[in-house]
Amino acid sequence: MLSAAVLCGVLALSGCDKDKEGSAARGPSPVSVVKVTRHDVPADMTWVAKTESSRAVEIYSRVNGFLDARKYTEGGMVNAGDVLFLMDKKPFEVQLSEAQASLDSSLAAHEVAKRNLNRIRPLAKLKALSQTDLDQAIGDFQTTAAAVSNAKAQVENAKLNLSYCTITSPVTGYASSALQTDGTYINMSNAHLATVYTMSPMWVTFSMSENEEAKINQEVKEGILRRPENHDYEVQLELAGGEIYPITGRVTFSSPNFNPSTGTFELRASFENPNNQLRPQQYVRAIVKGATYVNAIVVPQIAVQEGSKGHFVWVVTKDNKAQFRPVEVGNWIGNDWLIKNGLEEGDKVVTEGMMLLASEAPVKIVQEVDQKPAADDKAKK
């Protein structure tokens, strides 16, 4: 038994010696590194957003009556002034005729009162008629004049109601489907007939959470982040499938109110849409540009690993040894990662070959590049 134990020990020692010899034979591990430099980095932020017509005009009937006909193509483009619906005009034409007849009667009565007053006034001066007769004539003249004014107003009202039978679009845009069918009696309860959506400019709305706003404000306070002058943020749209919309927009509205039900603040950007490529209610990605990370450190995402205690990188020391370095990360910036703490300018961060590294293990740099700013990269929250 003793001989067997001694033999096993000898074999184990022999194996250890062979491992050391193998490690020494391999020599320093080859690695590629990026040399850390500080520079200003675009702090682009991305949100899921939704397109919205800048002017969605609901088309209502202003009069009660039967809907005669829809005159537009549902879902098609209409121009300002185009006829959308026709109401039955006949009842309103009758009302106009009645109002005109009433006006004619009032004008005739007023003309009689006027002539009567013109006869009575000189006779009253000669004392041929009493003051009472004159007062009565003046009263008749004024009463009939008021009746004429009222009759004229009734005619104008009848003309207005008749004009309301022709329902036109106040804006240029795409028209929805008709909400009422031909022949339906329209009143206050079903007067909404359609909606016309203006296509340019197009609004894009998105929401920033309370935590996101607090984080941005804190980074600005600490001098890490710089907002654009006058908060003039540019916005780029990424459409479904990854296509970038060719026209950039601007943030034009930031809600002063916090929405407690969603825990967010609403923001809105405006985009010109000359070719009607954008349609209302599309989901897009809004890439908000203009803010800058000041004097920042970024490293390739591939260099950053995550362990049980957080994120870390491997750094090559001055004596060419691997060093384990915990880091505090910020946002993704394209293919890079913002490093908030843990690295300094001049550090050499391993980007290839880190899988074979151990702390204080010798390494050999086979490729070294300076970290360059990527001006057009997109930051992800």
Please name every model-derived segment:
Residues 235-236, 296-334, 369-381:
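Short beta-strand/loop micro-motif enriched in small hydrophobics and charged residues
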Residues 71, 77, 83, 89, ...:
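Exposed loop and linker-edge segments at protein-protein interfaces
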Residues 37-42, 238-246, 254-260, 268-295, ...:
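Hydrophobic alpha-helix/coiled-coil detector that fires on Leu/Ile/Phe-packed helical surfaces
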Residues 164, 257-266, 335-341, 375-377:
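Short, solvent-exposed secondary-structure boundary/capping segments
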Residues 25-64, 241, 245-248, 252-253:
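N-terminal beta-strand block that forms a small beta-sandwich/beta-barrel module immediately after a flexible targeting
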Residues 36, 42-46, 53, 58-188, ...:
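Amphipathic alpha-helical coiled-coil/rod segments that serve as protein-protein coupling scaffolds
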Residues 1-29, 216-229, 374-381:
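N-terminal export/targeting signal detector
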Residues 29-32, 191, 201-202, 208-256, ...:
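Beta-strand/loop subdomains of soluble extracytoplasmic proteins
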